[in-house]
Amino acid sequence: MTRVCDIERFLYDWAPRDLAMPWDNVGLLVGDSGAEVRKVLVSLDVTEAVAAEAAAMGADLIVAHHPLMNCAWHKVQHVTADDAQGRTITTLLKNNVSAICMHTNLDAAEGGVNDALAERLGLQATKPLTDEKIGRVGTLNCEKTLVEFLQDVIKYLGCNGLRYVDCGRPVHRVAVGGGACG
């Protein structure tokens, strides 16, 4: 039997808690660590709609990127149906759905969010952008104009709009940073 704590441990093996920024709130945020898990819903955020979907599909666990209570200093003062967060937590608890969130630790982890961005853009010889390992910097396999590089960004990341200033310099070294990086 797989339990919530087993999945949390597996996720921490990939993206350790100590990679999270000090202000971040990661791990099991709602639910029972000992509960059995048969169905998991994966989501970017834990919203009212996601909680309702998890309940409707009979999920035992939501694994999300963004924390439900988004900062370590955000101490829940109340849980009521008067606001979206309260309704979300109430729905989860009523339906025995736990929620694990892996945020900046997943951004920083080897093979995590920033490595995925760098790989998608074809960056080579990547290394962490900061001491906290948030972001990555690497090189393209060949120089490109900014417009050529941005066409790749649109193509490989599915962007529908970009703002830029073309200084006429070729692009060879690129930094990427998802979420908390900037």
PLM region descriptions:
Residues 1-182:
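Hydrophobic structural segments
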